[in-house]
Amino acid sequence: MKTFWGGLILGLAAVPVLGIAYVLSGYAPAAVADRPVPLEQFLAGAALAARIHREAPQRDLAGFTDADLVAGANVYRRSCGCHGLPDSPRRGPRPVTFPTPPQLFTPDGYVTDDPVGVSYWKVKNGIRLTGMPSFKSVLSDEQMWQVAALVAKADKLPKEALDVLKQPPVPAPAAAPPANATKLQK
C-alpha cells in the first residue's frame, strides 16, 4: 500500500514539473501564429466569463440617447479600429494578433446580445492576452459607457451615429523630425 501512495504522490508531483519543463524548453506555443495548446482557449474564456459575470455593472440600455450613440461613434472611430467599421475594411493589427479581434459591425460580429455592462467592462478593463487594451486611463467613464452602448446597438444605430462611423479615416499626423535632426545631418 505504501508503494501505491508513494507512486501516486510522485506521479502528481511530476505533472507540474513536466509542465514547467515543457514551457521552459522553448517548444510551448508563444508566437501569434502558433496553434493554442489544449484547453488554452477554454481556460482563458472561462476565466474571462467568470470575472465579467462577477464584476460587470448593470445598466439599462434604454437610458442611452441618440446623442450618446453619436458621441460613442466618435470615440469608437478614434480608438477601436481593430474591431472594424460599417462597410469598411478592417484597420489595425488583425493579421498579427491572437485571437483575431471580432468585427463588431458585421452580422456575425455583433455583440448586441451582450448586456451593455459586459461591453463596458471589456472597454474599461481590457482582455488579457488578446491585445485588447484597458481604456480606463484614456477615456472617461461616460465615454466608455457611450462606446458600450454603441456596440450593444450596432445592428440598429441611428443614422447620425452611422454617418460618423462611415466618415473616411482621419490620416495620422506626420511625425515631427527629431529635435536634433539638424545636428545629425551636419
Regions of interest found by a model, annotated:
Residues 2-70, 74, 92-94, 113-116, ...:
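Periplasmic c-type cytochrome electron-transfer domains
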Residues 53-55, 76-78, 104-106:
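N-terminal start-of-chain detector that recognizes signal peptides
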Residues 60, 65, 85-87, 103-106, ...:
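Short, solvent-exposed coil/turn linker segments
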Residues 67, 73-100, 125-134, 155-160:
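Periplasmic/extracellular electron-transfer cofactor-ligation site
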Residues 96-153, 186:
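Extracytoplasmic electron-transfer domains, predominantly the class I c-type cytochrome c fold
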